[in-house]
Amino acid sequence: MYAVIKTGGKQHRVSEGDLLTVEKLAGSKGDSVVFDDVLMVAKEGEIRVGKPVLEGAKVVGEIVAQVKGPKIYVFHMKKRKGFHKKTGHRQQLTRMRIKEISI
């Protein structure tokens, strides 16, 4: 059984027990998170697709850790002027384990 959920502006295919990294969600380690935006569920050959979401379907996950993504460097430069600026960014992410998929 697997489901497709929408979180953080992205779609993720998940199954029970999967470890998933998503955009930062509020909460701390051990907290439970419920996803109500379930776009599709497949169970034993039967596929149910929502328009746009499935009513009554939910996916429950548990937060494993709050982490940061890889460092991204941004470099700005003006030609012939000697101006340049280098900045960095690390995206806040949440790592979670999927506990339950229900229809």
UniProtKB/Swiss-Prot annotation:
InterPro entries: bL21-like, bL21-like_sf, Ribosomal_bL21
Keywords: Ribonucleoprotein, Ribosomal protein, RNA-binding, rRNA-binding
Pfam families noted in UniProt: Ribosomal_L21p
Keyword Transmembrane helix included in the entry's annotation: no
GO MF annotation terms: rRNA binding; structural constituent of ribosome
A Gene Ontology BP annotation from the UniProt entry: translation
GO cellular component annotations of the record: cytoplasm; ribonucleoprotein complex; ribosome
Record's function text: This protein binds to 23S rRNA in the presence of protein L20.
NCBIfam families associated with the record: L21
Cross-referenced PANTHER family: 50S RIBOSOMAL PROTEIN L21, LARGE RIBOSOMAL SUBUNIT PROTEIN BL21M
Subunit and interaction comment: Part of the 50S ribosomal subunit. Contacts protein L20.
Family in the record: Belongs to the bacterial ribosomal protein bL21 family.
UniProt-recorded name of the protein: Large ribosomal subunit protein bL21
Species for this entry: Syntrophus aciditrophicus (strain SB)
Upper taxonomic lineage: Bacteria, Pseudomonadati, Thermodesulfobacteriota, Syntrophia, Syntrophales
Gene designation per UniProt: rplU
